[in-house]
């Protein structure tokens, strides 16, 4: 975590969980009840259901190449929402994208085809899983697909109680 003091770190995590996580879980359950679609239609419906407005100008979306290998590198200030927003924006142009994401987020059947699991370093077979991730990523790029990645590997966190979110060092 961001804090060296385990008590502070746990307190922040608890506050975040009690506020944002509960609301997010309610939204997810409501979305599931509404009939979450499989595949590419998932992204725009999820974004609308969550009440997220994407203000990226269409001329910027038009800069996304419609074909050919592409790597999208992004900061990660908002957690799950970052991947969803990028997926929705890329999906407006092409649906051959994959998001490198922690393995615990890959079990969602509706969007599993868009995920490449990134193992946690503490997993018993992390090295083997990491090699599989790399191979799958390279195969997808060689086939002309899009890879979306968050190089810090974690959500940006505040260094204090009220400060701005700061990106972690990149893990490249």
Set out the residue ranges of the language-model regions.
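Membrane-anchoring hydrophobic helices of lipid-metabolizing enzymes
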Residues: 1-73, 83-85, 92-94, 112-113
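Short, flexible loop segments at the rims of nucleotide/cofactor-binding pockets, characterized by
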Residues: 47-52, 76, 123-128, 163-164
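Amphipathic coiled-coil/heptad-repeat helices and related helical stalk/stem segments
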Residues: 57, 82, 130-134, 169-171
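Structural motif
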Residues: 71-73, 117, 148-150
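Gly/Ser/Thr-rich loops at beta-strand to alpha-helix junctions
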Residues: 76-80, 154-156
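Short, glycine/charged-enriched secondary-structure capping and boundary segments
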Residues: 86-88, 113-115, 162-164
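Conserved nucleotide-cofactor-binding alpha/beta core module
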Residues: 91, 98-142
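Membrane-associated lipid acylation/remodeling enzymes share a hydrophobic transmembrane-juxtamembrane segment
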Residues: 95, 138, 142-172
